[in-house]
Amino acid sequence: MALLTAAARLLGTKNASCLVLAARHASASSTNLKDILADLIPKEQARIKTFRQQHGKTVVGQITVDMMYGGMRGMKGLVYETSVLDPDEGIRFRGFSIPECQKLLPKAKGGEEPLPEGLFWLLVTGQIPTEEQVSWLSKEWAKRAALPSHVVTMLDNFPTNLHPMSQLSAAVTALNSESNFARAYAEGISRTKYWELIYEDSMDLIAKLPCIAAKIYRNLYREGSGIGAIDSNLDWSHNFTNMLGYTDSQFTELMRLYLTIHSDHEGGNVSAHTSHLVGSALSDPYLSFAAAMNGLAGPLHGLANQEVLVWLTQLQKEVGKDVSDEKLRDYIWNTLNSGRVVPGYGHAVLRKTDPRYTCQREFALKHLPNDPMFKLVAQLYKIVPNVLLEQGKAKNPWPNVDAHSGVLLQYYGMTEMNYYTVLFGVSRALGVLAQLIWSRALGFPLERPKSMSTEGLMKFVDSKSG
């Protein structure tokens, strides 16, 4: 309760009432996440039912021809509870900004970065957890982490030229054999119980993902060496970095930050929308998340931080490592004039510097201020936005999360760029699976939008203009 009160003071009266309401919903002394959900869900079901009865026919927005041909950009068509992306403020997790999460969410003993367990608790419940609640979640995931033997055998027999994301997707799909939801659905479980089985599967999957991801890493880059055993006294990120083979406490802190800030980014991005869509068919969390990972593997979604590193490396190769602002400016213009973009800058929704970039920059300033690659990234931060503004084409000239993450991973020795999207995937599970639980709890139906052909669209427009 003291933590909730502190949060209310930090966020002001606007959010204080929400925090007090959350405190009434579930005792801060309760550490069982499922029990808290069981209390929250009926209240939220009733609230939404009343809202729909009163406002179900209210028009939310208009759809244009350009939206239909342009990837549905800007089209309001989904309800997604766990996070909202504001063009100016960036992502808010259940109403909390990244700086607020960094301040309020529990941290490891001696650590400074938020624990992803706390972020998951927040995404699921809307409440800032206590240290005891986060500790319960760490131990619960450790208890559920063991992989079935057929998945281990599968991972060990993949060819080394199979992309890490393909391995992740296949292994998660194979975990479907363990699905509580699929089994219960086949036995005719009541719809009101769907969320409980989705919760169990989601908890199991999140617990097992670091083991899968670490095994992929060890098989591909560490000659198949063992990942070791899960330590129930360590947090989720610490166990993950141990299994990867990294013992630097700063790298573990980076991983806590990385897994927190990449967890969710509203519902319209490819991975979030895919899990939502596939889950609406009542596919279990393993199948839904595997589908999301196939979307994340696409170069337009999950490969951006690799593209940044490739561009930075090429820049250093062509103009040197200690480059003047003037030479850097010329190189940026050459990139743009050749028809290419500056990777790591711009965003489909954001119109300011991505707060996920900012917190990584702060981490670098604290832990690696003299690293040459970080200094180059910092130098670009001063120059690129002005060049893009001069060019006049970019709606958002500011850096996004991908402009920084790869540089930090490289500094601590993780140089295998093909693997970076796997880390992204492990993190993204927190957001999309939290939402999947709520999608089933709220009874969201099968997603089935109406499509039109170009011919049909032309006839429709003609009828409107005539």
From Swiss-Prot:
Pathway per its UniProt entry is: Carbohydrate metabolism; tricarboxylic acid cycle; isocitrate from oxaloacetate: step 1/2
> Pfam families, from UniProt?
Citrate_synt
Q: Which CDD domains match?
A: ScCit1-2_like (cd06105)
Its EC number is 2.3.3.1
Provide the primary localization.
mitochondrion
| N6-acetyllysine sites (modified residues) | K76, K321, K327, K375, K382, K393, K459
How it assembles, according to the record, is:
Homodimer.
Q: What else is known?
A: Citrate synthase is found in nearly all cells capable of oxidative metabolism.
Q: What does this protein do?
A: Key enzyme of the Krebs tricarboxylic acid cycle which catalyzes the synthesis of citrate from acetyl coenzyme A and oxaloacetate.
**Designated name of the protein:** Citrate synthase, mitochondrial
Q: Which organism is it from?
A: Macaca fascicularis (Crab-eating macaque)
The beginning of the lineage is:
Eukaryota, Metazoa, Chordata, Craniata, Vertebrata
Task: State which gene encodes it.
Answer: CS
